[in-house]
Amino acid sequence: MPYEKGPELSGARLEEADFSNARLHAANFEGAKITDAWFYNADISGDLEGLRLNGVEVAPLVAAARARLFPELTQLQAADPQGLAEAWAMIEARWQATVSRARELSEATLNDRVDDEWSFVETLRHLILATDCWLRRMVKGIDRPYHPWGLAGSWLSDPGAWGLEAGANPSLDEVLEVRRARMDEVQHTIAALTSEELERVCVPPDAPGHPNREHTVLACLHVILNEEWEHHRYAVRDLAVLEGN
């Protein structure tokens, strides 16, 4: 079942609301307070900073558990050129293996969504956009950094303002060609880094796009690495379902 645009509930007070089996996507719970709730067999993902469950700060516990489950996460927080190069090499190797695995399936299957999440092809298109946002717009300062096939979430109400084609339907090979070029850009940028360059503050161009505030080069690269790692995890998860079908 596709998602519907949700109601504006900022400041609302709800009692005895039944959300059993509900699906909430891109929901903002900043400052929300939920009491006397039942979270049996619930699945929550997202940013958890400041979240408390029964009086306990959750984020540090989740971070520690994820570090045990995924030891490679420490690589993604590298703060020097060599460490970043090693982290990116790990990302590239994982995606190369996963794309080879995905090619065993039909292209139609790779455009199928699992549980209404992005398809494999859509995931690759989103990562093109992520690179355009954080590398081309921020680190390189390009005014119009976006490839038209980049894919944003529902939060972007006017993709055309960024130069994105909302109705684009490129083939897997076409997407992979753009994706390869973007990954090469990341690799070349990291290879040329110095420790001083990592501390440089990037000012976003005065043009439509995201982000809209300053970040260091290191912070931008950390976002790219985390986007790549998280979406690779989702892609592998969904490929397993598609293979089973």
State where each predicted segment sits.
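Long, well-ordered alpha-helical segments
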Residues: 97-106
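Short, contiguous alpha-helical
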Residues: 107-162, 184, 201-245
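Tandem repeat scaffolds
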Residues: 1-68
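Amphipathic alpha-helical repeat elements characteristic of tetratricopeptide repeat
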Residues: 78-81, 85, 92, 117, ...
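Alpha-helical packing segments of well-folded alpha/beta enzyme cores
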Residues: 87-98, 130, 134, 171, ...
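Proline-centered turn/helix-capping motifs that create local helix->coil transitions or kinks
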Residues: 143-144, 187-199
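Short, helix-capping/interhelical loops that line the mouth of catalytic, cofactor-
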Residues: 57, 61-87, 135-183, 242-245
